[in-house]
């Protein structure tokens, strides 16, 4: 039986539990806190910023994935040194750390996207809002937002 390690014990990791069971996959979760949403499958509680802890976790699984984009790529690079497959790759994860970089990368690949733009300053605000279809529209922080945090409907 393959063992998948998930870094992050949030909602997405929690949703992976029944899917893993149905597929016959053993799931281990590296959670940040005891009471995380994925507590049912949590096998390690610790700091995913600690490369030594992540490397130790990586030795017990066949592949590592993550339940959010905030895992630093350096940490995953260290885990990969243990010989564990990281999927998606740390390089792919890098594209998700900044929504502007992600959108630009998707555009270069020809991936369909909703209308979007970057408000650089107060003066560009009206032009960008007009270009994306006017009000109401969604404004997002390029870095650090998730689960509605850093998101505003205007």
Show which residues each predicted segment covers.
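Active-site nucleotide/adenylate-binding loops and adjacent lid/helix of ATP-dependent enzymes
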Residues: 95-154
């Amino acid at each position: 039986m393959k063992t998948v390690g998930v870094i992050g014990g949030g909602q997405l990791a929690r949703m992976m539990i029944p899917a893993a069971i149905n597929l016959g996959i053993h799931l281990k979760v590296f959670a940040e806190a005891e009471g995380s949403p994925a507590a049912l499958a949590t096998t390690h509680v610790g700091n995913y910023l600690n490369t030594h802890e992540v490397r130790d976790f990586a030795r017990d699984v066949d592949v590592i994935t993550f339940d959010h984009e905030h895992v630093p790529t350096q940490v995953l690079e260290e885990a990969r040194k243990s010989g564990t497959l990281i999927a998606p790759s740390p390089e792919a994860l890098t594209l998700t750390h900044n929504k502007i970089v992600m959108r630009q990368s998707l555009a270069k690949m020809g991936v369909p996207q909703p209308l979007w733009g970057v408000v650089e300053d107060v003066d560009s605000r009206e032009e960008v809002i007009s270009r994306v279809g006017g009000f109401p529209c969604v404004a997002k922080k390029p870095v650090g937002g998730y689960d509605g945090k850093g998101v505003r409907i205007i």
